[in-house]
Structures are given as C-alpha cells and as structure tokens.
C-alpha cells in the first residue's frame, strides 16, 4: 500500500517534511528525531512503527493514514490551536529545534501529560464522565468518523466498555456495521476481539453473521496477534488461522541446527526455567507473554532504526532505547524484570519465545504437562498460586477470571489498566550477586522506613503543638476585638475568628485535590480551627531525611494539606546591609515586641514567629532585598519616613479593609489549591489594590514605630507577591516553570501580607482602647 496521502505529509510534532514513522495509538506521523522520543516514552504512551520497513496489516496502515490526513493531530494540540491560549507561552517544536530538551519536553507534554488535549468543562465525577463518553463511543463506532472516536478515547472512553442496556461492546457494534478501521482503532486501544456479548457471541461472530468475512478474519488475527508476532519474529511466518492458530519453530531449529546462535538453549538452567514457566498461573503467564511481546517490538524497531539512520548524526546514546521504558502502571519488580529482557542474547531470547509459544498452545488446548512439577522448588508466590487452583492443565471456565485460557493478543497488547502483581523474569537463574544486592536493598529500605516513621512521629507532635498555639492566639484575638471590660476567654475560637486572616476554611465543601508531595494525594483540606490535631497528624507523610535537617515546620492557620511551608533560609544565611529599610523594619519590630507584651497582649501576634534579631522576611530575605531595590517599592517605603503623624484610623475601617485583603488572599489560595496558576496574576493585582487601600487609611508618616514596620512589611510583601505571580508566565516561550516552588513562594508572600495586616489590626485595636 502506498504511504502517500492526498497532501504533503509532515511530522505531527515538529512539522519536518517526509515523516518515516507512525504512532499507531495517536494516529499521527512523526520524523526520525521525534520518533526517538516516542520510543523512549514506551508503548503504553505511543506505539510506533516504520512506514516502509516494518510489516503492516493493510487495514491498520489505512487506519493510521486516515487519522493523520483527517486532523487527528489537532486532538493532541487542541489548546495550541486556540487563539485564546496563545498567551500561555507554549509553542510547537520546529524542525530546527534540538531533540533534547526542546522536542522531548514538548512531546512528553503533548502525549504523556496530555497538556494540550481539550479538557471537559465539568469533571466532578470522573466515573460518570467516563461512562457517558464510553456510551458515546458505543454509538459512534457504527459510523466511519475515526477522528471522533479517537477524540472520545483521548478523553477517557473505554474501548472495552460493556453497554448495560444493549449488552454489547463498541467492537461488537463496529463488527456488525462492517467498520474495519473503527475495529482497528478499538483493538489498538485494548478492545478484545474475543469478548462475548450478553448472549455469548463475540465480535467475530457478529462480523460473520453480517457478511463481513474479511473483517472477521482480521479480528481472528488480532485475537492471536501476540503469538503470531512472536512466531514471525523467529521464523518470518504466521499461521493462516484456517488450519491452525500456532506455529512453533522449535522442531525446525532442533533438526537443522544451523549454528549455535540459532539453536535452542538446552542447558539445565533453561530446562528449570521452562518448568517454572509451566508452573505459572494464567495471570502471571499472561503478564510474562505481554512483556516478551513488548521486548520483541523494541528489538524489531531497534533493527529498523539502526538500518535507516545516519549513524554519524542521529544514532547517539540519547536516541537509543536500550531496554523497555518504565511503565508506571506496573510494579517496580515487574519493570525491572521487563528491562532485564534486554540482557538476553539471541539464543536465550529465542528459547524463551519458543517456550512461551509452546506453553500458550498447551494452555489454549488444555493439554497436560509432559512431566510432573511436584518436586520443583517454587517461590512462595508461585506456590500460593498453585494452592488456589485445581490444575494448570484444565480449561478455564467463564466464571474463573484467573483460570481463563490465554487471552487474545488484542487485549494483551494495550489493555494494561488492571492492577498487576509483580512478575520477576529473573526467577529462572538467580545468582549470588543478585541475591546479595536484593538483601542489601531490603535492609536499606527497612532502615529508611524506620527513619521516616520517626520523622512522621516528630512532625505529628509539632503539629499538635502548633494546633494548641493557634487556638490560644485565636482566643486572644477574639478578646482584643471585644469592648473594654472583663471578657472570659473561650477555650475554642469562634466563627468570628476568621478575621485572623488566611482562612480558606470558609469554603467548607470543596472537592479533594492533590496536595503537595509531603502529603497524601487527594487528602481532604480542612481548617486548623475546626479539625482535631490527631486527625490532621494521621494525614502527614514524612519528608525525606535530607530535607529535615535544621528545618522548622510552621503553620499559618490554614488547611494543613496545602499551606505548610518550610523555612529554608535562616537569619544567619542572609546578608543585610545596615541601610536596608527591610532590615531596619525587622529590627525595630523586634525591639517593639517587648512594648507590645507590656501593653497586656498576653501572647505573641497570631502570625509572629520570627526570632529576636531575625529579619521579618527570613524565608526569602535575599529576594526581598533585591525587590526593595526597585524604584517604585523604594519610594513607597521611603514615604513612611519623615515627620511623625500621631493619627490612626478607626478600628472598624482597618478591620473592613483587612477583611477585603483576607478575601482576596483566600481567592489566591484557592487557585493555588486547585492548581489554577493562570489565576495568580489577577489575584495578586486584587491583593495589591486591597493592600494599597488599607495602607491609605494610615498617615504617610505614622508616629508609632510598630505601625511603620507593619506598613513596610505589608507594602513589600504585596510588591513581592506580584513579582512572584508574574513568574507563572515564563519570559521566554517554552521555558520551564517550577510551579510547586513558585506556589510555595506565593503562599509565603500571602503569609507575610496576612501577618502585617494582623499586626495593624492588633495595634489599632490596642491604641484605640487606651
């Protein structure tokens, strides 16, 4: 079949002309350089095949060209094509760009992170959404609109979805309608050609009954694709599926004995490995067969890659794929076993493939083993599998999912969403060195677990201390807000304590979101003031040990899951000049701490956690000094100096402006919690406006030094917040942005603003009472 389409073909990722590779699962054509990145992602992300030098079923190649020519690439680049999204700074790679890091980062974002795919407007219930999408897919496959079905699959529709009302899967519908290309696409995404409908009929039966005999034969080939691909890799032949479904090249190799590299490995280790292979449960055997299938695909693509590339320019260490990439859906043990397959030489790998083909045929036909395995020394996992099953040689029933016959290759190629147990492929020959390495790694892991448990306990104690301190400070703040006179101090904060700022807890019903790395993903966010300390402590996950040395964890009366911040810079590590206004405000604020205590506050301010002599902006002191050098901020801070003005605004006005600042901070923190980084800039502008209005209540040259220090901190923090939020838009298109670090910096700025505003409320309230 000709690979030329109706228009000039270009690479879907960088627009290079004359692409030589195809991504089957994405429906796009890619050039050699971009293909190297696709291969490094793994088959679970992109299944690649050379357009000219690889063997193609005609209908599969037609399906890929149909998708590519009908704009399937726009599915994966939806937001890049939207003019409203151009301001994000992301751009498509060019042919002249370097593979690393420009092309590789773009391709990873496009296919692995799905950063440019159209997002549904409402995803509150992912289960309902996936079900609705799957029903749409069930209806769409009867038509010839391939790109619509690919779009539904990209949004989360399930190719093996069983319609509860109609009792069929999408592949049944496509087979009945004779939609061969739709069937190819569904099989690529994991549809099983052997899955029965409510009456026990398969898609193959539907195609034959409707008179689509070529489609029925193609579905049979898809059903046995795994064993067909393994046999073709060894001998270049496939069964016709009319006279038989299996070709075992074992007999030909034994009789001919062409050379040592082509003969079977008949060592004792190989024989023992074959016995262990026969003793595997059907599920573990299926996993092993899928892993070997992926390794065959890698080796075939490697051979094509080496035969087609310019070795002086393209074949480098960074473009090679020496072993199977890690699949995050698999366990670490299984991923290690998959990668060890690359260490098999040609003879060992051929022996393994022949053993798998023989075992697959035996299990499919229900034949018994030729030799008993009672005396084998099996691992504990394999022995437990044996205890749970009657006989490996029996034909499985429909009800027993673990003892079903070897599933169709269409399902085993890509239907990887099920939870998998580990399957160590090195069980056949475990050397002493591997045993010692595993033992050492286990001891190291146990020591690390013990250390993390101690750290977790320490963090839990610290959390409870902070909880008690916050309750105490809230009670004091409530007391300060009461009219003069004896007022009993409540044991718990009231609802009016929300004026202590930073209270995103006002939003009581909020969907769980993924928190930062120090907490469990998806843990519910609750305010400190309303959640018991023990409950919050149980959610804590320990830091890595290297992150805990001399680091203090502190809280700002905010949800524990999001607004915990580490002090990473101490006072001794920041250099301040004597003339720095920020340093002077810090020192003056520290000197005034004793005055505040003599006025009868009874405790420190709600947000006061700086030490004597330590800058108020200790966490990012250097960044504040750099920011203070800006002319606008310098002029703002200098305006606080001069002849003193003893006047102070009313407490009600200060509280009113403080509430406005608090409201805007809550909006910013909600955006941070929901990872809406594009909302940072407008939120910071609102906060800056509210801070400006609050600062305008006070005289330009206040007489009280605490007021001047707090105003300095308030203005400086607002300017710094704007500066940090602007970093969400990179200065250069495509520049990487560390959003986790940036979010922590933004939260720190919000904390400093809240701290300064709280100090102004406290000072104004106290001065008005005197």
From Swiss-Prot:
Region (Interaction with IKBKG): 429-629
UniProt effect for mutating residue 392 to F: Loss of interaction with NCK2
GO molecular function: gamma-tubulin binding; GTPase activator activity; identical protein binding; protein phosphatase binding; protein tyrosine kinase binding; protein-containing complex binding; scaffold protein binding; small GTPase binding
Reported impact of residue 298 to A: Loss of interaction with FAK1, decreased interaction with PCLO, no effect on interaction with ARHGEF7
Polar residues composition bias: residue spans: 366-383
Regions of compositional bias (Acidic residues) in chain numbering: 394-403
Region spans: Disordered: 363-425, 574-615
Tissue expression notes: Widely expressed. Expressed at high levels in testis (at protein level). Expressed in the brain, including in CA1 hippocampal neurons, in the amygdala, and thalamic nuclei (at protein level).
Region (Required for localization at synapses): 375-596
ZnF locations on chain (C4-type): 11-34
Region (Interaction with MAPK1): 420-475
Role: GTPase-activating protein for ADP ribosylation factor family members, including ARF1. Multidomain scaffold protein that interacts with numerous proteins and therefore participates in many cellular functions, including receptor internalization, focal adhesion remodeling, and signaling by both G protein-coupled receptors and tyrosine kinase receptors. Through PAK1 activation, positively regulates microtubule nucleation during interphase. Plays a role in the regulation of cytokinesis; for this function, may act in a pathway also involving ENTR1 and PTPN13.
Subunit: Forms homodimers and possibly oligomers. May form heterooligomers with GIT2. Interacts with G protein-coupled receptor kinases, including GRK2, GRK3, GRK5 and GRK6. Interacts with PPFIA1, PPFIA2 and PPFIA4. Interacts with GRIP1 and forms a ternary complex with PPFIA1 and GRIP1. Directly interacts with ARHGEF7/beta-PIX, forming in vitro a heptameric complex made of a GIT1 dimer and an ARHGEF7 trimer. Directly interacts with PXN/paxillin; this interaction is enhanced in the presence of ARHGEF7. Directly interacts (via C-terminus) with TGFB1I1/Hic-5 (via LD motif 3).
Name of the featured protein: ARF GTPase-activating protein GIT1
Record organism: Rattus norvegicus (Rat)
């Amino acid at each position: 079949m000709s690979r030329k389409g109706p228009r000039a073909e270009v690479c879907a990722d960088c627009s290079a002309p004359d692409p030589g590779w195809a991504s089957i699962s994405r429906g796009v054509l890619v050039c050699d350089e971009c293909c190297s990145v696709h291969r490094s992602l793994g088959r679970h992300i992109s299944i690649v095949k050379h357009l000219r030098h690889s063997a193609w079923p005609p209908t599969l190649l037609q399906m890929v060209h149909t998708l590519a020519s009908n704009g399937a690439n726009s599915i994966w680049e939806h937001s890049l094509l939207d003019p409203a999204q151009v301001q994000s700074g992301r751009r498509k790679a060019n042919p002249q760009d370097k593979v690393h890091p420009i092309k590789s980062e773009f391709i990873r974002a496009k296919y692995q992170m799905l950063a440019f795919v159209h997002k549904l407007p409402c995803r509150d219930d992912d289960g309902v959404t996936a079900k609705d999408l799957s029903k749409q897919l069930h209806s769409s496959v009867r038509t010839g609109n391939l790109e619509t079905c690919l779009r539904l699959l990209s949004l989360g529709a399930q190719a093996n979805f069983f319609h509860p009302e109609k009792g069929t899967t999408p592949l049944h519908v496509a087979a009945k309608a004779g939609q061969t290309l739709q069937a190819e696409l569904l099989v690529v995404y994991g549809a099983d050609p052997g899955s029965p409908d409510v009456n026990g009929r398969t898609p193959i039966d539907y195609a034959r009954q409707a008179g689509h005999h070529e489609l029925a034969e193609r579905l049979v080939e898809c059903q046995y694709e795994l064993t067909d691909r393994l046999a073709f890799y060894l001998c270049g032949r496939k069964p016709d599926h009319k006279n038989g479904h299996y070709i075992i090249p074992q007999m030909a190799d034994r009789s001919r004995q062409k050379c040592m590299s082509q003969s079977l490995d008949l060592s004792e280790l190989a024989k023992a490995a074959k016995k262990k292979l026969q003793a595997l449960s059907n599920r573990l055997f299926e996993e092993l067969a899928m892993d070997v299938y992926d390794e065959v695909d890698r080796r075939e693509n490697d051979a094509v890659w080496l035969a087609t590339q310019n070795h002086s320019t393209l074949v480098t260490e960074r473009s090679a794929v020496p072993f199977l990439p890690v699949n995050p859906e698999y366990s670490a043990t299984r991923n290690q076993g998959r990668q060890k397959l690359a260490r098999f030489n040609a003879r060992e790998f051929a022996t393994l493939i022949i053993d798998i083909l023989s075992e697959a045929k035996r299990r499919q036909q229900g034949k018994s083993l030729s030799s008993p395995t009672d005396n084998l020394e099996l691992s504990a996992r394999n022995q437990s599998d044996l205890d749970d099953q009657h006989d490996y040689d029996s034909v499985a029933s429909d009800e027993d999912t673990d003892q079903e016959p070897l599933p169709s290759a269409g399902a085993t190629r890509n239907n990887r969403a099920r939870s998998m147990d580990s399957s160590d492929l090195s069980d056949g020959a475990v050397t002493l060195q591997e045993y010692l390495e595993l033992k050492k790694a286990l001891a190291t892991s146990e020591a690390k677990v013990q250390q993390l448990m101690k750290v977790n306990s320490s963090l839990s104690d610290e959390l409870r201390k902070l909880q008690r301190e916050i309750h105490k400070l809230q009670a004091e703040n409530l007391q300060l807000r009461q009219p003069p006179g004896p007022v009993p101090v409540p044991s718990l904060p009231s609802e009016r304590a929300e004026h202590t700022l930073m209270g995103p807890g006002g939003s009581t019903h909020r969907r769980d979101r993924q928190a930062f790395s120090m907490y469990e993903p998806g843990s519910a966010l609750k305010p400190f003031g309303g959640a018991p300390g023990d409950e919050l402590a149980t959610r804590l996950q320990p830091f890595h040990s290297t992150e805990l040395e001399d680091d203090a964890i502190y809280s700002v009366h905010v949800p524990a899951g999001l607004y915990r911040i580490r002090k990473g810079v101490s006072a001794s590590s920041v250099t301040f000049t004597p003339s720095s206004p920020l340093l002077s405000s810090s020192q003056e604020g520290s000197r005034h701490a004793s005055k505040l205590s003599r006025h009868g506050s009874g405790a420190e301010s709600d947000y006061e956690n700086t030490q004597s002599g330590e800058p108020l902006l200790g966490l990012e002191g250097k960044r504040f000094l750099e920011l203070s050098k800006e002319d606008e901020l310098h002029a703002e801070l200098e305006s606080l100096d001069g002849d003193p003005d003893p006047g102070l605004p009313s407490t009600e006005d200060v509280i009113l402006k403080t509430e406005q600042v608090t409201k805007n901070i809550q909006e910013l923190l909600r955006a941070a919690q929901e990872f809406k980084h594009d909302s940072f800039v407008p939120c910071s502008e609102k906060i800056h406006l509210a801070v400006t209005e609050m600062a305008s209540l006070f005289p330009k040259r206040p007489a009280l030094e605490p007021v001047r220090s707090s105003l300095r901190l308030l203005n400086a923090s607002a300017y710094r917040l704007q500066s940090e939020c602007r970093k969400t838009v990179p200065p250069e298109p495509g520049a990487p942005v560390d959003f986790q670090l940036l979010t922590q910096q933004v939260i720190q700025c919000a904390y400093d603003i809240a701290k300064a505003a709280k100090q102004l409320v406290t000072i104004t309230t106290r001065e008005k009472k005197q």
